[in-house]
Curated annotation (Swiss-Prot):
Organism: Philenoptera violacea (Apple-leaf)
Source domain of life: Eukaryota
One cellular-component annotation, GO: extracellular region
Keyword list, A-Z: Disulfide bond, Protease inhibitor, Serine protease inhibitor
Any Pfam family matching the protein: Bowman-Birk_leg
PROSITE patterns the record matches: BOWMAN_BIRK
Paired cysteines (S-S): 18-71, 19-33, 22-67, 23-31, 41-48, 45-60, 50-58
Protein name (database record): Bowman-Birk type proteinase inhibitor DE-4
Gene Ontology molecular function terms on file: serine-type endopeptidase inhibitor activity
Site (Reactive bond for trypsin): 25-26
Transmembrane regions listed in the UniProt entry: none
Biased composition (Acidic residues): 1-10
Residues carrying the site annotation Reactive bond for chymotrypsin: 52-53
Assigned protein family: Belongs to the Bowman-Birk serine protease inhibitor family.
Length: 80
């Protein structure tokens, strides 16, 4: 009975939704991830925009009311 594995293909670590650079300037929060990734956005991004360079520099244009956890491994959280 692992019905949860049918919907989602196994994701690689790099495609999991995460955001190291997230900005919010309002209340309620409007957060937008400003991370730049090569050739694609994270798996939960609905609106992804990439440059036409090779490799493409892609950023997610979604505006949410939360930020994903940082992409870096935990332990680097103290640095601002």
């Amino acid at each position: 009975d692992d019905d949860h594995s049918d919907d989602e293909p196994r994701e690689s670590e790099s495609s999991k939704p995460c955001c190291s650079s997230c900005c919010t300037r309002s209340r309620p929060p409007q957060c937008q991830c400003t991370d730049v990734r090569l050739n694609s956005c994270h798996s939960a991004c609905k609106s992804c925009m990439c440059t036409f360079s090779d490799p493409g520099m892609c950023s997610c244009l979604d505006v949410t009311d939360f930020c994903y956890k940082p992409c870096k491994s935990s332990g680097d959280d103290d640095z601002z």
